[in-house]
């Protein structure tokens, strides 16, 4: 993918591009993330979604979709507020995202609308208290969760 093609995609989606020596980041608003991922995966060479990661960055949760091409990487990045952690699922267009989104839902509490695992546990045990905070959010006290699960 040329930098010109990526810049055109970013412009169309209301996003920005930050290019590094090996990794380029396409940052887009949350309501454009599906279109961005489909756009990236349909361009020549950017065919492989390797994973999706999430990070607690304070008031928001950042979601990064990692694509691979040879020795270069491209990330589609967006953010959702912790107060309303919902995002459209890419699984309707990129089925490879199904389990990655389900994992992020479990550990960071982001609901991916349209994901077949929405509301189901895939990593956390069934005994994990439904009223406990997601375990990878900043400020989550693992000792408190252990007590809630009656493990201490």
Residue ranges and their predicted role:
Residues 1-152:
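Terminal low-complexity/charged segments
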């Amino acid at each position: 993918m040329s930098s010109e093609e990526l810049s055109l995609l970013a412009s169309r989606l209301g996003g920005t591009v930050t290019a590094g020596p090996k990794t380029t980041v396409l940052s887009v608003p949350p309501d454009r993330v599906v279109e961005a991922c489909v756009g990236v995966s349909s361009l020549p060479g950017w065919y492989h979604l390797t994973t999706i990661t999430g990070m607690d960055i304070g008031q928001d949760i950042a979601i990064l979709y990692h694509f691979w091409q040879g020795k270069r990487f491209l990330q589609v990045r967006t953010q959702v507020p912790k107060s309303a952690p919902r995002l459209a699922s890419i699984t309707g267009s990129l089925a490879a995202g199904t389990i990655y989104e389900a994992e992020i839902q479990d550990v960071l509490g982001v609901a991916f609308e349209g994901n077949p695992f929405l509301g189901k546990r895939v990593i956390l045990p069934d005994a994990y208290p439904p009223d406990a905070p997601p375990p990878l959010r900043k400020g989550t006290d693992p000792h408190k969760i252990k007590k809630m699960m009656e493990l201490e």
